[in-house]
Regions:
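Extended acidic/charged loop-beta regions that coordinate divalent cations
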Residues: 92-93
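Conserved N-terminal catalytic core of the sugar/cofactor nucleotidyltransferase
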Residues: 1-53, 64, 161, 190
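Short, high-confidence coil segments that cap the C-terminus of an alpha-helix
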Residues: 46, 73-74
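Glycine-rich phosphate-binding loop of ATP-grasp-fold ATP-dependent ligases
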Residues: 88
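Catalytic-core segments of class I nucleotidyltransferases/pyrophosphorylases
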Residues: 48-50, 57, 62-70, 81-85, ...
Length: 195
């Protein structure tokens, strides 16, 4: 997709999905995550909606997250995963001897995977352009008992650095992308017109 003076939309392959609408909204360069969400409120239909930051990939079952969200009646659900350490973890004795080494272990606790299900009431928690969704709105929802966590134990990987970008592209190119849950559909033949 290219926007601007010479806008262009290209569809890759043949897809059977129906009823999808994509809206691109310019929320400004200086607007923070909560402010961006507030600015797109007018484009969101219905009482329940999904949102993600778009910088992580996962094999999370979105239907299960949505069902979990509907089961508890709270304002928001965040998908959580175990933290993954970027470096090996060492246990070191007092004199410097390494007693245990674990390469890039999964940590204890939970971190946000950045996949959310929200009710429209979420907009009551958002401020202006400076509002950071991950701070005051989510902190307030948690204090009020309106934020639930859906634990995902499958694949999750964030793409925040060039190194992560390279790793994820390598997985894709080797056809080892665990987040690719869809089947490729052969493209339909193109009809050539002389018009």
């Amino acid at each position: 997709m290219r926007l601007g003076e010479k806008s262009h939309l290209k569809t890759h392959g043949h897809h059977s999905e129906e009823g999808f609408s994509v809206t691109l909204a310019d929320t400004g360069l200086d607007c923070m995550t909560g402010g961006r969400l507030r600015k797109v409120q007018k484009y969101i239909d219905g009482d329940t909606f999904l949102l993600t930051y778009g910088d992580g990939v996962s094999d999370v079952n979105i239907r299960r997250v949505l069902d979990f969200h509907k089961s508890h009646g709270k304002i928001a659900t965040v998908t959580t995963v175990a933290p993954i350490w970027r470096f090996g973890m060492l246990e070191v004795a007092g004199e410097g001897a390494v007693t245990n080494f674990t390469e890039k272990p999964k940590g204890e606790g939970s971190i946000s995977a950045g996949f959310f299900v929200c009710q429209r009431e979420i907009f009551d928690y958002l401020g202006g352009d400076e509002c950071i969704f991950e701070h005051e709105p989510l902190e307030r929802l948690a204090k009020e008992g309106q934020l639930m966590a859906f634990r995902h134990d499958g694949f999750f990987y964030a793409m925040d650095t060039y190194r992560e970008y390279q790793h994820l592209n390598d997985l894709w190119n080797r056809q080892a992308a665990k987040w690719k849950l869809w089947e490729d559909v052969p493209a339909l033949p193109r009809l050539v017109s002389n018009r």
